[in-house]
């Protein structure tokens, strides 16, 4: 899915509001995913995935940090996510069907917390961006 100039502008603009809140946004998105889609928990055996766990917050910060990197390299997400895609495919062996699930939950959290800035056009652009990231992450599985 090709991001238009407007999409790129919208994603960068909304991401300015994400900065400084990476941990909270990431943790809430992960927690929502684990609660609503419990099969996604299988990749985190013996980890505390409760809402306030330090592991969940640390991993959430890492996830949103990776997305911040994708925003910074929005014209070449393939290259920016190449190593991360390799890791998820070869080392972690995460089912690529889970990437869109997390993308959906990130979209929900952004919509809740950034409501005044999360217009319909921003929603569409961020959805396309997260879908692109999910596609790139799954690309090494082929």
Curated annotation (Swiss-Prot):
GO CC annotation: blood microparticle; haptoglobin-hemoglobin complex; hemoglobin complex
Similarity annotation: Belongs to the globin family.
Tissue: Red blood cells.
Alphabetical UniProt keywords: Heme, Iron, Metal-binding, Oxygen transport, Transport
Assembly behavior: Major hemoglobin is a heterotetramer of two alpha-1 chains and two beta-1 chains.
GO biological process, one term: hydrogen peroxide catabolic process
Record carries keyword Iron: yes
Protein name in UniProt: Hemoglobin subunit alpha-1
Function text: Involved in oxygen transport from the lung to the various peripheral tissues.
Superkingdom of origin organism: Eukaryota
Binding site for heme b: 88
Globin domain mapped to chain residues: 2-142
SUPFAM superfamilies: Globin-like
Positions of O2 binding: 59
Entry GO MF terms: haptoglobin binding; heme binding; metal ion binding; organic acid binding; oxygen binding; oxygen carrier activity; peroxidase activity
